[in-house]
């Protein structure tokens, strides 16, 4: 970018029911306790399953997401076309399959300022129920790191944080199959430009993905969320000016509901990122990003700059937005 009781035999159930009936009749015969009072007492004693049901945004673990980031950082620099990025791909695929997702590799070759490079997007859909409707919402991140000749760039925040978050979202959402089948996960390769962002340099994966969608007909997707650089210890999510207004309102409302609104604001300048090619083909996609990050594209973009709390904040708000707004209908 740039500026997740055993069944009781019927007979035993009947016996318990008969004994309960006897006890109630006995109470009514030998006590002055009104039936209404007894019914109220029994009703109050029955626990409510709804009251104790865990909300999906409460299931997200910033600590688990951070472990994914750590694994990617441990691989070292993994720019597009490198041996290390193949290891990153294998790790992402393994984690997604463990959470119940089927992964497809979308491989292609493109011209770059460094010559032809092979890129691979990873596209995941939830397993099972092949007759279900096609996914209608995109969740995206890039997983490559920028290529530098002079520094060792591991991209803990830029590439790592959003990938770790998306893997944790996959775990949490995968526990709710009906919701998971509405979502397509996309891990873009080649987000980073080799020289300067332009129509032909940078956003290689998202540009190719959008082009294929447009050729096939992109009408099935009614929206998407892109995550990028969301792990900064001093978190300040800044939505770009080109954010689809309705989606921005939903993100702000989700943050407000979780009492996290102070972490979300608007960016005061335009931003080029992987959401742009999707918006260009009329898939309203919002970029959740903290672009004011002092270590962007430096050797100091390392794991110590990332916090589980920041990942927790972003993941919780995203899940609230998905469950209460984006996928509500």
Regions found by a protein language model. Name each.
Residues 84, 105, 109-111, 223, ...:
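Active-site-adjacent substrate-binding region
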Residues 150-254, 258-259, 267-270, 275:
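Acidic/histidine-rich catalytic neighborhood of metal-dependent amide-processing enzymes
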Residues 65-78, 148-150, 187, 234, ...:
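Acidic/histidine-rich, surface-exposed loop or edge segments in extracytoplasmic proteins
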Residues 56-58, 67-129:
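A non-catalytic alpha/beta surface segment that caps or lines the substrate-entry region
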Residues 64-71, 87, 91-98, 103, ...:
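Extracytoplasmic/secreted proteins, especially bacterial periplasmic and envelope-associated proteins
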Residues 72, 106-108, 126-128, 140-144, ...:
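Active-site-proximal beta-strand/loop segments in catalytic clefts of secreted hydrolases
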């Amino acid at each position: 970018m740039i500026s997740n009781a055993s069944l009781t035999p019927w007979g035993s159930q009947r016996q318990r029911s008969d004994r309960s009936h006897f006890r109630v009749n006995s109470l009514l015969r030998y006590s002055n306790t009104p039936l209404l009072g007894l019914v109220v007492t029994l009703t109050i004693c029955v626990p409510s399953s709804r009251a104790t049901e865990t909300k999906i945004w409460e299931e997200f673990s910033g600590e688990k997401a951070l472990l994914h980031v750590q694994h990617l950082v441990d691989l070292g620099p993994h720019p597009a076309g490198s041996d290390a990025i193949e290891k990153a791909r294998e790790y992402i695929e393994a984690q997604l399959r463990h959470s119940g997702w089927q992964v497809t590799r979308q491989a292609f070759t493109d011209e770059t300022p460094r010559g032809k490079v092979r890129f691979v997007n990873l596209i995941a859909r939830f397993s099972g129920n092949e007759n279900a409707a096609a996914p209608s919402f995109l969740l995206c991140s890039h997983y490559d790191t920028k290529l530098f000749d002079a520094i060792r760039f591991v991209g803990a925040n830029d590439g790592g944080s959003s990938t770790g978050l998306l893997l944790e979202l996959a775990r949490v959402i995968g526990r709710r199959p009906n919701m998971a089948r509405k979502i397509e996960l996309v891990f873009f390769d080649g987000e980073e430009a080799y020289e300067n962002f332009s129509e032909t340099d940078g956003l290689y994966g998202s540009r190719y993905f959008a082009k294929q969608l447009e050729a096939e007909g992109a009408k099935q997707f009614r929206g998407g969320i892109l995550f990028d650089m969301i792990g900064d210890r001093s978190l300040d999510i800044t939505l770009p000016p080109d954010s689809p207004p309705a989606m921005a309102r939903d993100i702000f409302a989700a943050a407000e509901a979780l009492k996290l609104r102070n972490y979300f604001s608007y960016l005061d300048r335009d931003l080029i990122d992987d959401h742009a090619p999707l918006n260009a083909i009329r898939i309203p996609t919002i970029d959740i990003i903290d672009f004011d990050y002092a270590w962007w594209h430096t050797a100091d973009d390392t794991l110590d700059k990332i916090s589980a709390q920041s990942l927790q904040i972003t993941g919780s708000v995203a899940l609230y937005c998905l469950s209460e707004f984006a996928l509500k209908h």
